[in-house]
Amino acid sequence: LILAGWASNNKWSLYGGMRSAAQIVSYEIPAGLSIVVVIMLSSTLSMQGIVKYQEGGIFNWIIFTNPFAFVAFFIYFISAMAETNRTPFDIPEAESELVGGFHTEYSGMRFAFFFLSEYANMFVVSGVAATGFLGGWQSPIPGYFNTPLWGIFWMLSKTMFLVFMMIWMRWTFPRLRVDQLMNVCWKVLLPISLVNIFGVGIWTLVFG
């Protein structure tokens, strides 16, 4: 992103690329710590193992197993929105400040690739959230609708629901300022993520 902004030979593009890089690096940390919660609860790094851990219906999904898991999901979802530059976290391409951000000077297929990559990123982070917190391809009803075809349906449904939530939040919330964006990450999400990991550890020791 920095190279895309720098190569445009435009100050607005360079500012947008630098903002985007700083934002992604910052929000990777709380997102990663939220995934650590999933790994601690499922005791595996395998995504297939994580989904298998959640079989048995909707109340076995990690998001509903304990309050710390719900907090981890919320933090991951907010961080994922920030990483994909979705409103209210679209500071790198704020029209009122940077014209169009790092893709100001791009048009045609180059702009289309930037545009498509943003939506592809939304689907990827939503798929990871569905796998880690919402049971992946597992049916919400124990013992029913668990065939491979139904698994594809459940996985796509959960992913599309999270994508819809991202788009809905874009329509609903105003854009944050740069200082507010960084304060949310370093002063709110990161401390809560660290405390949340300790909470999950204690929960696991007490309740198994």
Give the predicted meaning of each segment.
Residues 1-208:
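Selective transmembrane helix interface/packing segments
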